């Protein structure tokens, strides 16, 4: 199963995996009937249970999700799903924001809500997360000296990113209804 691509229902694929087989899952599943996927049914409870089963004890699941607005209210599906993963036994390790550079449906000047331009990236773990953070944020205070001319408390040249990740999204040359960076 390693280094393979399976173009099938994820429940079929995961059913062939042993317990604790996966170290990292990053996925952005369909949500709130925003798109039609030619007869695909999104069985969230079954998918969540299988993800928990196949995730390694030190594994991580990144669930990228958003909410539709229906009858003037956001659905809250993202939060219900996050709570369900926690109910199954996952720990909510981090709540991150995936900020897009543009929106398919920008707010109008006379609208009563702002342009929806982000999705949640819920980072779940079964146990302790040992992976290192991406440290590519340049520190403007690195090498700074105090008034006496001494090197102030050492500040590294680079620090970990924040939990808001900005991505440029594009559909150039991509024939997918929901492109992902």
PLM region descriptions:
Residues 1-181:
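Core catalytic lobe of class I
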